[in-house]
Amino acid sequence: PAVKADPLPVSVSKEFDPQAAKFCEPVMKANSSQGFTASVADNLGIESKPLRVYSQVKYGSVARADADVFMKFPKAGYKEKIWDHAAGVIIVEEAGGVVTDAGGTPLDWAGGRYLESLDRGIVATSKALHERLMDAVSKSWSSSQL
């Protein structure tokens, strides 16, 4: 028989200091630029190594405050599919977090099966870290070869 327990609410991290922040990214290098993610983490001041996880576990990690930031920057030509992100975005937002593209715009689900209007990548974090994360993305982008 199933064990009944009271549900526990989840909440994104309250971490405000990027040096103490933890970040996660996709395991798969085939469709994601881990080097660019490392550059963003460095520009943000994150000192920890990335937590590399599969699927929507990344969103769950941010929603539970196991990670403070999730970043994914797809390689040129790769199209993000909505089913890889939709449920995770809802979970992070319900936990008090923010999910946007790398330009700071909320994800647009109206383009069919792909996130056609995606600006460079996807980030998920707390409201406390989002603006600084956007600054780090911009700084990394201006010095990258992507």
State what each model feature region is:
Residues 1-5:
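DPxDG-like acidic metal-binding loop motif
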Residues 9-146:
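An extended, acidic
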